[in-house]
């Protein structure tokens, strides 16, 4: 002891001798440290300014409901948090007395508030002298009072409280901020709309530093009723979750999809071997772990009780404690059960499919041919099946699990033979014949697609009675054997989009179950649900529980939940929802987790930036705007629409017409290539139609038209129009100027654009009716009678029968090379067409032959119910006589005779230049 005292005295004298030099060196080092910290904070501030600018653009100029936008916002917010934490760490590395005023100004409190989306009016009310450091030193009640005084809402207070707690955690650890560790649950809360408010924020919902048991804290907490925090943790943003030290300090790693691996299950059951040495951390003194919670092991039934290992007792000092884990908050006294109706991992059952336009759920690229899983409805390329996520049966009835013989179920998928337990969320009723097997007795040698090893089962609580007969009760009995103490209410099923809303129960009358949520890019589950334990009673304050807002919503993407919908065809499942433009839902109480509309995804595929289009000379002018020749990966036709693109109703109508164009693929219909959908440049881009319009072709005296050529042109038009009608598209503007003819090929253009004619800005007159003669003769009588000044064209009663009437006029033009009513005033034409008398006079005054007149009279029928369909018109065209030329008279027609009759039937003899002359009956 004396020797140690002498050595200490000698060291003290040595320090006094060199004290002056050390003090000077320390002063110089402190100044250099402050300078370096200030420089680092300045560089970080530049990055913060850039990130805030990008974040402001995403929040104000982009659709926040888009999944890609939300992902970018979360990424920028995480970057800003990391930069601000680094700024504060740089400032804290300098002693308080050596910091300059400029260094003390970092990090800026306004940047912190904008990161967590605090309203500008709240930021303006915050005092100038309030800093982030001062806010960190306040307790929770004082922070709440300060923010409330500035006008912050409960949601904003909850977000800032949660963020400050995470920042205190990072500062207390003294380590570098991890981007995905502390803020993932906050992002998930804010994304689902159920962020932690100051009223519900408790110690159980806050992240605890590594090494502390959240189970113990939840059990020892005396603030309010015991509860747990339920939040969705996206797999892409959260670390590998595991149980914390509450489970005898045994870590159970899980996959990103949230299910236990066979290796994790083995490590959970088997006592640990020699623990590994922990690196780069100080060893903790040996201590005995807390006894395992009996309530927790009810999550995994029929597992043997873990016994304490003697070798483990002696090597506790080498145990690894600092493992990032997902903390499970479990309420004491709450029975937990294994639920296998959701998250059941089975092998994909792919079948080949083809779509007009579809997005691969794996590579996010468009595809036409691919495969679709009959279990989880995953759609992807055949080559992408290797990278496809694990298959999940989601609310599928048992009848839909039967194997089909289309494609083997193991396409590019190795069969996992190991039986894996999974956690479920929702009760699913089974019939009496469907007896679910016990989870720990799964047959690993059975077929992966067999229903005996992959059928969802019904949950039931474990009996806690000491009766020996109850010990043999299977973990998943039928619903009839369910304990009467736990009453699971039926879920509120929303027919649209298969959403389940669960009422939020009171903490004093129910128990809560923690759910593991997995997030896939396109085929995702956002699971956040509660279960009831009793019928909804009245709470302590007199309010009924069913009057509380539904705050937790489950959304199953492309999953069918009800039995009546099990027989729905695949075509209905893949239909486009044009009425959902843009993505809209019926208003529900409480926040709802949205997914991007399927229509919005399709429109993104066909959107062409206007800057990529090379605009050429104008080639036409219509009532909707000018048509230009242009180039976009080749020669195209660009139709610029003169409409107010900033009007949301007009823009929605335009996108609906784009959807009509998108679903057309026919050789006689113009090829749609895309559309410019960003105002003010709205345009439809189609393939460039070579050749001439049918209007100019039939009026050219140099072209010869015989019966074979007119029949061929008419058949091509009927094929294209029949295809459009089969797709549910009404042309509304069929005329010879909208039909192109080139080398025997007919192409129909400008179909469906009448739907937006009422919103065109150019040439609009409210008190005038602008009509052109080349349009009147194509209109059906029911449309002409409805035309009045001030009534838009898109409000007229267009129908498929009206298209047939317009085809009759085109058929007349092919025969007579002119319009049926010419050289007449517009008023006279309106009366003759509207009354039907004008077309009758045309049919009686012109001799076009019996077969031609029959087609005209059928198409021009006054009653629209009497007009034939295009399929019947095709049969009528087939009955037209065939032209057999004589070698000696190549320029004239023949005289055909009826074989079955001795009477000579008059036929077409020859065409004049614009006039069709009838044949001589005497010949």
Swiss-Prot record:
The gene is KSR1. Belongs to the protein kinase superfamily. TKL Ser/Thr protein kinase family. The protein kinase domain is predicted to be catalytically inactive. The domain is sufficient for KSR1 and KSR1-mediated MAP2K1 and MAP2K2 membrane localization. The domain is required but not sufficient for MAP kinase-mediated inhibition of ELK1 phosphorylation. The N-terminal region mediates interaction with BRAF. Also mediates membrane localization. It comes from the Eukaryota. Its EC number is 2.7.11.1. Residues 175-192, 557-570 have a biased composition (Basic and acidic residues). The keyword Flavoprotein does not apply. Residues 444-473 have a biased composition (Low complexity). This is Kinase suppressor of Ras 1. Zn(2+) 2 binds at residues 360, 363, 381, 384. Disulfide bonds: none annotated. Signal peptide: none annotated. Keywords: ATP-binding, Cell membrane, Cell projection, Cytoplasm, Endoplasmic reticulum, Kinase, Membrane, Metal-binding, Nucleotide-binding, Phosphoprotein, Serine/threonine-protein kinase, Transferase, Zinc, Zinc-finger. ATP binds at residues 619-627, 735, 750. Phosphorylated on Ser-311 and, to a higher extent, on Ser-406 by MARK3. Dephosphorylated on Ser-406 by PPP2CA. In resting cells, phosphorylated KSR1 is cytoplasmic and in stimulated cells, dephosphorylated KSR1 is membrane-associated. Phosphorylated by PKA at Ser-888. Phosphorylation at Ser-888 is required for cAMP-dependent activation of MAPK1 and/or MAPK3. Residues 1-172 are annotated as: Mediates association with membranes. It catalyses: L-seryl-[protein] + ATP = O-phospho-L-seryl-[protein] + ADP + H(+); L-threonyl-[protein] + ATP = O-phospho-L-threonyl-[protein] + ADP + H(+). Homodimer. Heterodimerizes (via N-terminus) with BRAF (via N-terminus) in a MAP2K1/MEK1 or MAP2K2/MEK2-dependent manner. Interacts with MAP2K1/MEK1 and MAP2K2/MEK2. Binding to MAP2K1/MEK1 releases the intramolecular inhibitory interaction between KSR1 N-terminus and kinase domains which is required for the subsequent RSK1 dimerization with BRAF. Identified in a complex with AKAP13, MAP2K1 and BRAF. Interacts with AKAP13 and BRAF. Interacts with RAF and MAPK/ERK, in a Ras-dependent manner. Interacts with 14-3-3 proteins including YWHAB. Interacts with HSP90AA1/HSP90, YWHAE/14-3-3 and CDC37. GO terms for cellular component: cytoplasm; cytosol; endoplasmic reticulum; endoplasmic reticulum membrane; intracellular membrane-bounded organelle; membrane; protein-containing complex; ruffle membrane. It holds the Pfam family SAM_KSR1_N.
């Amino acid at each position: 002891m004396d020797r140690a005292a002498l050595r200490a005295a000698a060291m003290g004298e040595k320090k006094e001798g060199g004290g002056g030099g050390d003090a000077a060196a320390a002063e110089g080092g402190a100044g250099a440290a402050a300078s370096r910290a200030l420089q680092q904070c300045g560089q970080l501030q530049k990055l913060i300014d850039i990130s805030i600018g990008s974040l402001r653009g995403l929040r104000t100029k982009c659709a926040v409901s888009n999944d890609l936008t939300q992902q970018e916002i979360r990424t920028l917010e995480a970057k800003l948090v990391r930069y601000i934490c680094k700024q504060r760490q740089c400032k804290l590395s300098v002693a308080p007395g050596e910091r300059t005023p400029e260094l003390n100004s970092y990090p800026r409190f306004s940047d912190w508030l904008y990161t967590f989306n605090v309203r500008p009016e709240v930021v303006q009310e915050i005092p100038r002298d309030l800093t982030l450091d001062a806010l960190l030193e306040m307790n929770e009640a004082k922070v709440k009072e300060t923010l409330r005084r500035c006008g912050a809402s409960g949601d904003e207070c909850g977000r800032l409280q949660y963020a400050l707690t995470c920042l205190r955690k990072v500062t207390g650890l003294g380590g570098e901020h991890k981007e995905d560790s502390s803020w993932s649950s906050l992002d998930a809360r804010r994304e689902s709309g159920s962020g932690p408010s100051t009223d519900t924020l408790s110690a159980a919902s806050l992240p605890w530093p590594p090494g502390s048991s959240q189970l113990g804290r939840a059990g020892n907490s005396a603030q309010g009723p015991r509860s747990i925090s339920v939040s969705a943790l996206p797999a892409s943003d959260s670390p590998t979750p595991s149980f914390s030290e509450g489970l005898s300090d045994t870590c159970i790693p899980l996959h990103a999809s949230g299910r236990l691996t066979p290796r994790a299950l083995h490590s959970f059951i088997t006592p640990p071997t020699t623990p590994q040495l922990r690196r780069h951390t100080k060893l903790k003194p040996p201590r005995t772990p807390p006894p395992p919670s009996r309530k927790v092991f009810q999550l995994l039934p029929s597992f043997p009780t873990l016994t304490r290992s003697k070798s483990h007792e002696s090597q506790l000092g080498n145990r690894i404690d600092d493992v990032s884990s997902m903390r499970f908050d479990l309420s004491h006294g709450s029975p937990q059960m294994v639920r296998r109706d959701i998250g059941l991992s089975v092998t994909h059952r792919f079948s080949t499919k083809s779509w007009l336009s579809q997005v691969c759920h794996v590579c996010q690229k468009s595809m036409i041919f691919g495969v679709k899983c009959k279990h989880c409805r995953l759609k992807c390329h055949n080559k992408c099946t290797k990278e496809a996520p694990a298959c999940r049966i989601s609310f599928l009835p048992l009848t839909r699990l039967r194997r089909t013989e289309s494609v083997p179920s193991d396409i590019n998928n190795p069969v996992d033979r190991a039986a894996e337990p999974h956690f479920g969320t929702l009760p699913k009723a089974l019939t009496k014949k469907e007896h679910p097997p016990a989870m720990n007795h799964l047959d690993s040698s059975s077929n992966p697609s067999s229903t005996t090893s992959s059928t969802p089962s019904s949950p039931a609580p474990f009996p806690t009675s000491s009766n020996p007969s109850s010990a043999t009760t299977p973990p998943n009995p039928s619903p009839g054997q369910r304990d009467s103490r736990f009453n699971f209410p039926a879920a509120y099923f929303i027919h649209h989009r298969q959403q389940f809303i669960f009422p939020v129960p009171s903490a004093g009358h129910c128990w809560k179950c923690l759910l593991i949520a997995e997030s896939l890019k396109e085929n995702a589950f956002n699971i956040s649900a509660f279960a009831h334990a009793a019928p909804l009673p009245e709470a302590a304050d007199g309010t009924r529980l069913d009057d509380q807002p539904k705050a937790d919503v489950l959304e199953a993407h492309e999953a069918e939940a009800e039995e009546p919908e099990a027989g729905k065809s695949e075509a209905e499942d893949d239909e486009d929802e044009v009425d959902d433009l843009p993505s809209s839902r019926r208003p529900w109480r409480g926040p709802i987790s949205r997914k991007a509309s399927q229509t919005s995804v399709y429109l993104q595929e066909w959107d062409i930036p206007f800057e990529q289009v090379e605009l050429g000379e104008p080639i036409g002018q219509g009532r909707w705007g000018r048509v230009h020749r242009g180039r976009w990966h080749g020669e195209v036709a660009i139709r610029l629409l003169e409409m107010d693109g900033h009007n949301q109703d007009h823009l929605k109508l335009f996108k609906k017409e784009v959807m009509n164009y998108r679903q057309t693929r026919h050789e006689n219909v113009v090829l749609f290539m895309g559309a410019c959908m960003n105002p003010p440049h709205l345009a439809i881009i189609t393939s460039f139609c070579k050749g001439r319009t049918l209007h100019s072709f039939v009026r050219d005296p140099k072209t010869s038209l015989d019966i074979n050529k007119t029949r061929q042109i008419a058949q091509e038009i009927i094929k294209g129009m029949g295809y459009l009608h089969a797709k549910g598209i009404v042309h509304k503007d069929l005329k010879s100027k909208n039909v192109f003819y080139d080398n025997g090929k007919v192409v129909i253009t400008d179909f469906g654009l009448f739907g937006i004619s009422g919103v065109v800005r150019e040439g609009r007159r409210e008190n005038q009716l602008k009509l052109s003669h080349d349009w009147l003769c194509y209109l059906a009588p029911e449309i002409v009678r409805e035309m009045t000044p001030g009534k838009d064209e898109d409000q007229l009663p267009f129908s498929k029968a009206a298209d047939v009437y317009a085809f009759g006029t085109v058929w007349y033009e092919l025969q007579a090379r002119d319009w049926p009513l010419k050289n007449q005033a517009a008023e006279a034409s309106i009366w003759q067409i509207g009354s039907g008398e004008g077309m009758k006079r045309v049919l009686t005054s012109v001799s076009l032959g019996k077969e031609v007149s029959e087609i005209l009279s059928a198409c021009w029928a006054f009653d629209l119910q009497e007009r034939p369909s295009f399929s019947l018109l095709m049969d009528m065209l087939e009955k037209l006589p065939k032209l057999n030329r004589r070698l000696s008279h190549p320029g004239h027609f023949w005289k055909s005779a009826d074989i079955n009759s001795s009477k000579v039937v008059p036929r077409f003899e020859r065409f004049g230049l614009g006039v069709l002359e009838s044949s001589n009956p005497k010949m």
